[in-house]
Each structure stands twice: as C-alpha cells, then as structure tokens.
Amino acid sequence: RELVEACRRNRVDFVWAIHPGQDIKWNEEDYANLVRKFEWMYDLGVRSFAIFFDDISGEGTNPERQTELLNRLNEEFVRVKGDVTPLTVCPTDYSKLWANPTPQGSLAIYGRTLDPSVAVFWTGDVVCSDLTPETLEWVNSRIRRPAFYWWNYPVTDYVRHILMQGPVYGLDTTLTADDLCGLVSNPMEHGEASKLALYGVADYTWNVAAYNPIDNWERGLALLAPEVRDAYRTFAIHSCDTETGYRRDESWETETFRLADRTPERAAALRAELERVVRVPARMEQCANKELLAELRPWLVEFGKLGERCLRALDLMELYAGGDDAAFWASYVANRMTPDQMKAYEAHKSGTMKLQPFYEQAMDDMASGLFERLTGEKPAGCKGIGSFQNLRTTLSKLMFDHDSTTHYTSGVSQQDGDWIGADLGCVRDVHEVAILQGRNSVDDVDFFDHALVEASVDGRQWTALGDSLRTVYDIRWTGEPVPARYVRLRRLESPRTHWASVRSFEVNPVRAERLGFGVEADDLTAALYAFDRNPSTSFLLDGALRFGVPAGAKGYTMLLQPDADAAPASVRQYAADGTLLSETHVDAPLFRLTLESGAARVELEGALRIFEIIAE
C-alpha cells in the first residue's frame, strides 16, 4: 500500500503483474482465484494490472485460451471497476526470434480476438534488441494495434557481473503513438545504478523526436553524482558493454592498440586515461549518494585494479622493446593475473570492450614475441575466430584455457552457416582436432547438432575433416597431416535456434608420444603444457618434473614464475645410468641451464609455475 501511494503521489502507475505459470488449468477455479487476487490488490489501491504468459510451455501457451481469459477479465473486472487502466499482456511469442509468423500464430490470433484496449508486450527481433520501425511494423501488423515495447535494458540478469552505465541508445526517434503505445524498461537488480539508464528512457519517452543519447547521458551523470561527476563518467564510459548478446558501445573516447602498433603518442594518450581510471575508486568515495556508491563499490575496486595492470602492461611494452629478456620476463610474470584476481574481476567486470582486452592482448603479444625471439618460431597458440561477433572479444579465450568447466558462448541464436574456429597464426600440419561442444556433454542445448569440422590455408577454401556430425558433443578428428592455418566447426542445416557454446577447441594438442622424449610428473597431462611451444599456457609444479634430453640439446631456457613463499626450486642433471651430474637452483624467472656432458635426464623440483621449457 505504501508503494502504491508513493507512486500515486509521483504520478506513476503502479502495475501489479501475475504469471499464471506452467500449471494453469483454464477452469473456473483458476479464474476465481485470479479474480480474487486482483480484488485483493485493488483493495490495496492498485489500479493497473498485467498478465504474463512468457517462458512457459504446455497448455498455458494456448493463445485462444489466453485471449478468452483476458477478454473476460476486461469485461468482468476492468470495465466493472471503472477506474482500472487497460490490461497489459506479455504473450508467449514475445520475440520475433521464435514467434510463429503465420495467420495461425498466437500473435495473429491476438490480433483477431483480443480486445483492442489490451496492450501487448513485445521485445523485438530478439529478447534484447533495439526499438526499430521494422520490428514494430512486423508485430503490429499481426496484433492489429501499436505494441507495448518491453526493452530489456539495462537489465543484467544474463550478465550479472556487468553494470550497464552507458548511454541509452537504440531507440528510434521517428516513432509515434501510431507505432507503439508505450515503452517499458527492464532495470538491473541494482536500483540506484539503474537510474542512469532510466533517466535516458524517461527522456526518450518525454520527447522522442528530440532525444539525444549522449547529451542525456552527460546530464544524467551530473544529476546523479554532481560532486564526483568526472570520476563517475570515467567509470561509466568503460562500463557499458555486455560482452555477449546485446552489445553496447564502450570506451569510445579511448584508443587502445596491439604491441606492434604502439607509438609514443598512443602510449602517452592511453597512459593519461589509465591514470584517471586508477584514481576513480578513491574519488568516488566522495559521492553523496551512498546507496549508489554501495552498489558500484565492488566494480569500482576492480576498475582501479584494471587500470593498474594496464599501466604496468604499458611499462612492460617499453621494457620488452629494450631487449633485456630476463628483466622483462621477471616484470611480466609479476603482472599476470592470479586465479584469485581473475575470479574477482570476472565477478565485477568493466572495461570489457577495450581496457581488459588491451591488457590481455598486450600480455599475449609480449609472451608470443619473447618466445619467437628466443626460438625463431611462432608459438603454437590459437585465437578464436568465427561468425559470431563476440568471438573477437576475450571471451573466445575460454575455448583455449584447457579448462572444461569454462566455456565460450555466442550470446545470440545460431543459424545455418554459423561457425566457430581457431586461427593457428601460421600454416601448420594439422593432424588432430579435439572439440568439446555445449556447456556439458550430456543434455545441453547450446551446441551445433548438425556440424562439420573443416580446415583452410587461406580462410576461403575449406577442406572437410571427416564426415558431418549429428548430435555430437565430444568431437575428435585424427588423420594424415593437412596443411592449414584455420580450423573451424561449421553448423549445417538444422532447426535449432539456441546459442552456441564451446568448452574446448584444441588443434594438435600436445601428446607425450609426439614430444620425442619422456616426461614424468604426478599430473602428466598438465605437465605437458611445459613443452607445448605456447607460452600462454602453463603448468603449476608442486613436486618433481623429470624429462629426457633430446639428441643435440645443449641447454634449456625456462620461462618460469617461482613461488615467492617457497624455497628456490632445485634443478638436477642425471646421466643415463642415473648418476647425478650437477645440482643448482632456479635463481630467476627466466632461467637458463647449460647441460653437462652426458646429461640424459633433467629433474626440476619445487613450487613454481612453468610456462615453457625450451631446448636449445
């Protein structure tokens, strides 16, 4: 009752909505229970009501039954009361993505049979999508009335680790009351942090034709946090994108770059912005809106850390260019994110479009460059490619992290011809491909149920690796080597409209039998990553690792990260008969070992992370 009265004082219609749910029976008992609840809410002051038939299956989806119920409620409750606003309904077919477009579809049935006063929700072409004349024309021609647009923004129930703080855009400014009867915004669970977006939605609906997203955003920042407006703006401009699904522009005033494109001017400009980022958490503590600050604080903490590691990555670029490999690698491993740091960032992300990718790409580029400088060859790592837009983001790295509990997801519905793949960086002889589709291998729906593995030298002409696959989660191809730079899994004809997910995408995974020397460790599978010619992977040693010396080897360069809290790791060399030839200790992250004459086996014992062991 308090909420209803507060809404009335502020000229807001409080709408009470009910979801009849999966178990509706369409009988008199159900109807009587529904009316009874309406009466209870009416007695508390509610004068606006809605019924939702979204996200259900079974008998509850029957559009004829739905319209019969709505028409009866309209006749026996709304009109009888006299002071109740027209009903609102969310149909089961609330998105073009799965709506039946035919005259027999539920939307067309709504158009023919539903009382014209009832407003009908519509989310657009997909669940989260822009408000366009085209989507309204499509739905309005079927429901025979202007739709009530349900805009799923700034809601983050599908990306709870994100705060949507960017400008409100994607709303067409040529629309009139003939096109839509209303616009409802679905906010985040963070009420204060949602106000920046709601301010934009309110501004748009107040004067559609004159709405300007950036002008509105700038005013909203000053209105919500005037005393820390600049700091709030710095955070907000880097906290806009979802990374998946409904992508939003972010960091549009910031230019980032790859290692090869670094110039002093670009580095100086980025450094200035990153220094502003680092100052944001402390400055935001002066925000007078303590509820807003409390909601933002977990993200602000991680935002400051993001700025710090990006600044260190800039410094590392200079150190890398200087050519002192030992000094560079020592600073490099100190700037790597630990599992705990990554977990904290993943829970409260910002800077996902430019800042975190800058950090990750800079670190990857420098590690790859160092490997190439040490060996004269390109590392064996992969990067994600494909038809889905977010494969260009750092999300695609989840396919290559050797962790089957994580997964890349497309964030949008799959279609025939879609594909997910790997760029090997150069042409290699491909002899094995191993792919884990879906979020699990048992009953997940987010996978290509009809697909083909293919390889290509140039990305234009593709060769099939094996036959087409139907309903296969765990894919493995082996065969005679095929020269290729690109390997992909391409969807073939299928009615499936789910997202697509991949837990693992391996090309030529390292195998003990292919190394040419023996390896012994408690966890042999993990230990092989020390020899996979890819410095982006690593093996956490806590014990002993033993490996044979290949013919012709004179020494090793080891890319390591010693455990600062543990004793220095030991390195021992043994002859073929087991005689100990020498023993030393790891004294630097980039450790060089000269082999003794007759050395046949090396043993590394201690606690440290091994990125690569390179024979020379």
Where are the regions a protein language model picked out?
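Feature activates predominantly on carbohydrate-active enzymes
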Residues: R1-D30, K37, D43-R47
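Catalytic-core regions of glycoside hydrolase
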Residues: K37, L44-R47, I56-E218
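Short loop/turn motifs at secondary-structure junctions
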Residues: G45-R47, D83, D179, D429, ...
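Trp- and acidic/polar-enriched beta-sheet ligand-binding modules for extracellular glycan
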Residues: V442-V507, D565-E616
